[in-house]
Amino acid sequence: MKMVVEKTEKFDPEEVIEEFEVLTKDAGKIQEETLQKILEENGGTEYLQQWGLNGKTDSLSFKNCIPIVTHKDLEPYIHRIADGDLSPILTGKPITTISLSSGTTQGKPKFVPFNEELMESTMQIFKTSFVFRNREFPVVNGKALQFIYGSKQFKTKGGLAAGTATTNVYRNAQFKKTMKAMQTPCCSPDEVIFGPDFQQSLYCHLLCGLIFRDEVQVVSSTFAHSIVHAFRNFEQIWQELVTNIREGVLSSRVIVPSMRAAMSKLLKPDPELADTIFNKCSRLSNWYGLIPELFPNTRYIYGIMTGSMEPYLKKLRHYAGDLPLLSADYGSSEGWIGANVNPELPPELVTYAVLPNIGYFEFIPLMENLDGLEPMPVGLTEVKLGEEYEIVVTNFAGLYRYRLGDVVKIKGFHNGTPELQFICRRNLLLSINIDKNTEKDLQLAVEAAAKILSDEKLEVVDFTSHVNVSADPGHYVIFWELNGEASEEILKECCNCLDKSFVDAGYVGSRKVHAIGALELRIVKRGTFHKILDHFVGLGAAVSQFKTPRCVGPTNLSVLQILSSNVVESYFSTAFC
């Protein structure tokens, strides 16, 4: 059963909820039907034929024939498609668009097939979470201040349109129709969203938000990082924005002709609005509650706030004041997994109900068998409450039994479908010896050490890590960018706290016997992490899709170079001396 994307500008919320309830009540049956449909559409492809599926469409034959794979296994097939091979390689119907992952995890963007079925899944997820969100936090005839940035699409060697997953969505006509149907159209014109320069687009987004300040009911972005980044910038440029509004003249920093032309239609002299914004900003204490002061009718802040976005929540709450933070849905460049149908939960507790008709899902239990082999994956309706799994996806765009690399925990069930909590990326491990520390472990260590800074009214702007094995024994390196100057004494204390906060038994044991060297804390110049963002944007990533890499591997030389060349101070832990 596939939800039909409506072509009209209004949709019935009750109908969307009813369809969701029907889908989730019989999740097991819907999963079998979804797999059958995927295999019927693509049974004649080179990939499925080579594994001897021979037109079978049942799940047992599928699992017996088709291996579990990573992106590396499918890369040669995807590159042939991108290079113009029109034969049915992964899908029966030709792939016309390629999505690029952000590339922040592995250091370079991955190519992923994108098609109209994935676009339909996107709109289904958006609508489903919206109707649940709108029951709790209704918005009516408002606008959304969306910090979204559509990078340029380009043509692959074979003439396919290629762009980041977010760009492919934003450029699709269905996206704008759906936003309009949700009564939260973006307050920025397309010329700003698709502008060629991120800093100029950000400036115009903020200006559009201020012009429509009374109509803004939602402040959002793909990721929480982009919202925090936008308002950190606002702190620096707010007086210039006020002057633009007072005089009705756009700043000379915006030089893209199409952007200037679009903004000139919106910007008119408004001294009264300029005075209001000036007075509100002048009265704020350390910018606390900035968002509701600027946009008084805002109902909530919306974006992906889990995983690598959690470290930005403290600053986001500072800007949001009493406004609720609502975490957006769960997906990746490869496709969507689930919708947030419990919007009242804070980001730290948010769960995602898997939509059983947008793909076929399997779950690898995160425990080794006694013989050391990885356990067999289980189906969507076979997962157990409280257990952790890695997700395996089969979708309508040519990915079959594809390891997503995400670790999730089963927190409950909505009818027959599980509600997942995102835990971490499985492959983001700090490991030298027998130690194994995940992104979550790193995050907890940074949070513990950052509490020492907060007493000094300082904060960690951003952070990442690296395993240095150039010397023996190897050691962990943590890079911090701070919002001010910290004393040597404080930073030494932070360094020791970081080292002691990794509580993994393998790490602690290895540190005690000096099989792992002392943890190193390196402080980098202000703006270093912005240089990393610029680097990935230069590679073709969209700002809206950017995630700071939490662990920089040895092959990610460009990012290591940016970090290393901007180090201003370095400290080694004395915790295990």
UniProtKB/Swiss-Prot annotation:
InterPro entries for this protein: GH3 (IPR004993), GH3_C (IPR055378), GH3_M (IPR055377)
Induction behaviour: Induced by wounding. Induced by oral secretion of the herbivore Manduca sexta caterpillars. Induced by treatment with JA-Ile.
Binding-site residues for an L-alpha-amino acid, renumbered to this chain: T166, T167, N168, V169, Y170, K531, I532, L533, D534, H535
GO cellular component: cytoplasm
UniProt-listed Enzyme Commission number(s): 6.3.2.52
Binding site residues for ATP: S99, M119, T122, G163, N168, G331, S332, S333, E334, G335, W336
A biological process from GO: defense response
GO MF annotations, alphabetized: ATP binding; jasmonoyl-L-amino acid ligase activity
Binding-site residues, jasmonate: S102, A328, D329, Y330, G331
Keywords: ATP-binding, Jasmonic acid signaling pathway, Ligase, Nucleotide-binding, Plant defense
The keyword Nucleotide-binding appears for this protein: yes
UniProt superkingdom: Eukaryota
Catalytic activity: a jasmonate + an L-alpha-amino acid + ATP = a jasmonyl-L-amino acid + AMP + diphosphate + H(+)
Functional description taken from the UniProt entry: Catalyzes the synthesis of jasmonate-amino acid conjugates by adenylation. Catalyzes the conjugation of jasmonate (JA) to Ile, Leu and Val. Catalyzes the conjugation of jasmonate (JA) to Ile to mediate defense signaling and resistance to the herbivore Manduca sexta caterpillars.
Family: Belongs to the IAA-amido conjugating enzyme family.
Name the UniProt record assigns to this protein: Jasmonoyl--L-amino acid synthetase JAR4
